[in-house]
């Protein structure tokens, strides 16, 4: 509904019914009957990545966008980005998001700041946690980034954005970024992710962080300073994984992953001052003081 509410109408909507067992297939068919610019693809369940890849292969437009079905966008999203879209100048158009607990949560406006980056520089901004996130649903992509470079979302994996966005940035020529928050990301329970951890989720996240950090495709394009920034991003990700293992009390059950993450942290140890701008800097301090697990044990007690 939030896509249909857009003032800028030069788009098509592809609904991918990924083997839904509820009333979703019929709802999709009803939309197709009511709107001539909506089409539906019914397929067997293959997960989010396969659904996105299917959408890309059927899309007719110059750009593709992947909003999640339980989130929504501001009604002026496309019209606000129309100039950037219609110029056909940018390979990726990136905006910002607001984490909300319900539709009553309003987005807080900020003075608009826009930036234009070369693809590699946009990737570095993502590594710095500035201007650009690692998520896919707050970005509009030129379709040819996928088709011309044989890039797909990894099928059967969690955290598929983590394993895809860095490739897209590094083949992109020009990226438009705005700080404006057009995307509402719904969080029913802030702790729901940590409550639903399993071994595959830890493995997939750990695997993508390692892949990005050690990839020749990445390393060959970065200078020494940028490689160090990549290392800090990697360490920040490793600390997030280790902290999540401790918080969910799964570190002993998944001892192999816990040990591997610790080994990578030891191999890529950085100073506390170097981590000062990282989101998980406090957790890294606790890790270096050897009290990270204790901190979460105390938190769970109280």
Regions from the language model: what does each represent?
Residues 1, 25-29, 61, 74-86:
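Short alpha-helix within the catalytic core of nucleotide-sugar-dependent glycosyltransferases
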Residues 2, 17-26, 44:
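A conserved acidic beta->alpha catalytic loop
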Residues 10-12, 36-39, 89-91, 174:
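Structural signature of beta-strand start/N-cap positions in the alpha/beta core
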Residues 48, 69-178, 185-198:
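Donor-binding/catalytic cores of nucleotide-activated saccharide
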Residues 180-189, 195-221, 237-244, 248-269:
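Catalytic core of nucleotide-sugar-dependent glycosyltransferases
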Residues 247-302:
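Membrane-interface aromatic/basic loop that binds lipid-linked glycans or pyrophosphate carriers
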């Amino acid at each position: 509904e939030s896509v249909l509410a857009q003032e800028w109408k030069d788009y098509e909507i592809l609904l991918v019914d990924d083997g839904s067992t509820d009333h979703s297939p019929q709802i999709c068919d009803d939309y197709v009957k009511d709107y001539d610019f909506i089409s539906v693809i019914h397929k067997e369940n293959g997960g989010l990545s396969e659904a996105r890849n299917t959408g890309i292969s059927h899309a007719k437009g110059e750009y593709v966008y992947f909003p999640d079905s339980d989130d929504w966008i501001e009604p002026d999203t496309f019209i606000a980005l129309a100039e950037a879209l219609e110029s056909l100048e940018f390979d990726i158009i990136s905006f910002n998001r607001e984490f909300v607990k319900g539709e009553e949560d309003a987005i807080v406006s900020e003075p608009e700041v826009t930036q234009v980056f070369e693809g590699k520089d946009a990737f570095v901004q993502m590594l710095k946690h500035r201007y650009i996130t690692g998520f896919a649903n707050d970005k509009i992509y030129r379709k040819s980034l996928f088709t011309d470079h044989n890039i797909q979302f990894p099928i059967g994996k969690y955290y598929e954005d983590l394993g895809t966005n860095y490739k897209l940035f590094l083949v992109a020529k020009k990226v438009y970024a705005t700080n404006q928050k057009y995307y509402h990301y719904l969080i029913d329970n802030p702790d729901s992710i940590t409550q639903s951890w399993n071994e595959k989720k830890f493995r997939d996240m750990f695997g993508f962080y390692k892949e990005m950090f050690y990839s020749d495709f990445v390393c060959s394009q970065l200078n020494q300073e940028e490689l160090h920034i990549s290392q800090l991003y990697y360490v920040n990700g490793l600390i997030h994984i280790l902290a999540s293992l401790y918080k969910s009390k799964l570190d002993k059950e998944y001892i192999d992953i816990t040990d591997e993450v610790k080994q990578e942290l030891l191999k890529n140890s950085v100073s506390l001052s170097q981590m000062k701008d990282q989101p998980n800097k406090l957790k890294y301090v606790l890790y270096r003081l050897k009290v990270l697990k204790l901190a979460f044990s105390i938190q769970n007690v109280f």
